[in-house]
Amino acid sequence: MAKETFYITTPIYYPSGNLHIGHAYSTVAGDVISRYKRMQGYDVRYLTGTDEHGQKIQEKAQKAGKTELEYLDEMISGIKSLWSKLEISNDDFIRTTEDRHKQVVEKVFERLLKQGDIYLGEYEGWYSVPDETYYTESQLVDPIYENGKIVGGKSPDSGHEVELVKEESYFFNINKYTDRLLEFYDANPDFIQPPSRKNEMINNFIKPGLEDLAVSRTSFDWGVRVPSNPKHVVYVWIDALVNYISALGYLSDDDELFQKYWPADVHLMAKEIVRFHSIIWPILLMALDLPLPKKVFAHGWILMKDGKMSKSKGNVVDPNVLIDRYGLDATRYYLMRELPFGSDGVFTPEAFVERTNYDLANDLGNLVNRTISMINKYFQGELPAYEGPKHELDEDMEALAHETVKHFNESMESFQFSVALSTVWKFISRTNKYIDETTPWVLAKDDSQKDMLGNVMAHLVENIRFAAVLLRPFLTHAPKEIFKQLNINEPELFELESLEQYGALKQPIMVTEKPTPIFPRLDTEAEIAYIKESMQPPKSEESKDEVEEPSKAQIDIKDFDKVEIKAATITDAENVPKSDKLLKIQIDLGLEQRQIVSGIAKFYRPEDIIGKKVAVVTNLKPAKLMGQKSEGMILSAEKDGVLTLVSLPSAIPNGAVIK
């Protein structure tokens, strides 16, 4: 009989720079689910990969003096190396530059075009021919006004004259599927997880009205070309999302994997891209008349004490550093235990070292070491089969073992990894306490208690086996080492099914003669300092003299009072179609929500600014930039042509006036 299938995916990562611990978080979570489902007997297919097209990749390659593929091959080598080091058990790795993917993107685009879901339109903006770039009115140098309107100006990059032009663009008519999408949500209430994300999608995006989506670009050429109109490159919305089916051979000569595994059981992603997976992707699949995935799960961010990870802040955590220094299991355990999946979590060196020392070295490691040492001391390493009386606590321990398995499975099914691990650690802690309560060292002094002592030892070994089996999806080395030191060699005893019966481990039990620590204790102060040092950006070899910009003319306090500046939180951001420099940003001002269009796209990716607390000029007259309404201006600092958002402490409430 064929096994039931389970198809799981991570987002495909954009290889414009080295991956950090946040990327590892998504991929380790997917690996934990995959391993758990395999232990349950599922035929699992686990997909991850890279999103390799777009202007940023083109610019990165040019800056490095390489072709796009040369640059990408180097970056992908590092990504695959990290996944290997993390022992990610993915079954496939999709690159959007592969022919198997590009051919599917071409076919999907042409099909949607033919059936009228994609149409050709125009986008209007200020264009510099030498720069091959569109600019917003606010970006123009020396703007020319007529009757209060800008009618011309110069490029901020080259100084060339700009002209108002219209550019062709293909648009995806997603609004026509709104009612059908809402009906799907109603019929599948668990489709978007956690539930708070569903409310956010409906209230913030669907109810206000979905705008047709620009799905092609002509301002760069690194991407999949539209077959029927090759001057257009397919934009990210279709290119990247299609990977989930192109990797299975959809629309190819061999679609066996697609027929077997689609629809996906779960798409994992960070919360900033849940909108694309819960709105655009379902609509795209509806247009293709394909089944929709069963679930999209948006996990939170790994934050630092001072906000999101940033090289400039010196708080980027490289997973390679943690693995090389502390081992794979300590790294995977921390990610899944400390950070509640579905919510934001804070990484601190202190918590990492504490989890390693207290949970892994003290609780688990010492339990294994103490048990093996006692069996060696009291039974010369071989625990015979005993038929004697049980200790009064033994039935409680057996019941707790089964209860632990039940709660563990419930938590794993809902992807509550930290809760699942907490359940196991409560069991481990109770087992440690069981040693203190049964006092084996006292029983060993009385020959008449030998059978009782044997039963206590047998319960300790069985409890350790239960814990090791449950930890297999999370820890790839420690369970194997535990089984080895306990001399448990039967493969069936490593599986979840073996936990249905307490005492499945048959005696006699022969343990290793000299137990070795599974998790050595860390020097707390030294290792905290080491992690903090590894997070600092490399110091430049030479410090450049800073030249201050000349100040502008002085103003009166009355002039300054005319400007209203308030604190706001960025709740969403996305690129403005056909613009290389603009982001469309949604902000929360406390009593109202606003949209602002800001020229920071060259310095920030949309997902990097969501959640930031910023300063906003709120009494500017509304303007339209590239067809998008803008109701204010987010303050930023400029140095050497680089813009940096002015960030505010999170304690300042939204809407607070800044004076």
UniProtKB/Swiss-Prot annotation:
EC number(s) from the headed UniProt entry: 6.1.1.10
Residue ranges of the motif 'KMSKS' region: 308-312
Gene name of the record: metG
Pfam families: Anticodon_1, tRNA-synt_1g, tRNA_bind
Presence of keyword Magnesium: no
Name of protein: Methionine--tRNA ligase
PROSITE patterns attached to this UniProt entry: AA_TRNA_LIGASE_I (PS00178), TRBD (PS50886)
Motif 'HIGH' region: chain residues: 13-23
Reactions this protein catalyses: tRNA(Met) + L-methionine + ATP = L-methionyl-tRNA(Met) + AMP + diphosphate
GO terms for cellular component: cytoplasm
GO biological process, one term: methionyl-tRNA aminoacylation
CDD domains, per database record: Anticodon_Ia_Met, MetRS_core, tRNA_bind_EcMetRS_like
Keywords: Aminoacyl-tRNA synthetase, ATP-binding, Cytoplasm, Ligase, Nucleotide-binding, Protein biosynthesis, RNA-binding, tRNA-binding
Family according to the record: Belongs to the class-I aminoacyl-tRNA synthetase family. MetG type 2B subfamily.
Function, in words: Is required not only for elongation of protein synthesis but also for the initiation of all mRNA translation through initiator tRNA(fMet) aminoacylation.
Enzyme class label: ligase
Protein residues bound to ATP: 311
Oligomer status and interactors: Homodimer.
Domain annotation tRNA-binding: ranges: 559-659
